[in-house]
């Protein structure tokens, strides 16, 4: 007796669902003004999560840890302590 051993392959690709394909929108964190740049009061200087950079002179800290200028002046990024950084705004010399 003759036996045929046939193998049939799918003619259509099986379509399954995927668990990938999502990502959250970037939050655009980081420096918004450069060292030595002139800013007006209320300008956002640095957006961050937590206190990566601390507020210095004439700089406030928002509820989401955003640093902003309290007065018009020049931005200065500085180091303080051994491993900390702060940003200050100094009034323009007149």
From Swiss-Prot:
It comes from the Bacteria. Residues 1-9 form a propeptide. Coiled coil: none annotated. One of its GO terms (cellular component) is cytosolic large ribosomal subunit. Keywords: Ribonucleoprotein, Ribosomal protein. Belongs to the bacterial ribosomal protein bL27 family. This is Large ribosomal subunit protein bL27. The gene is rpmA.
């Amino acid at each position: 007796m003759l036996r045929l051993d046939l193998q049939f392959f799918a003619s259509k690709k099986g379509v399954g669902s995927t668990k990938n394909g999502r990502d959250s929108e970037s939050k655009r964190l980081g420096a918004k003004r450069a060292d030595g740049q002139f800013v007006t009061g209320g300008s956002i200087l640095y957006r961050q999560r937590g206190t990566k950079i601390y507020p210095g002179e004439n700089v406030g800290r928002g509820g989401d840890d955003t640093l902003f200028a309290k007065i018009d002046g020049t931005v200065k990024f500085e180091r303080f302590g051994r491993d900390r950084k702060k940003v200050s705004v100094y009034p323009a010399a007149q």
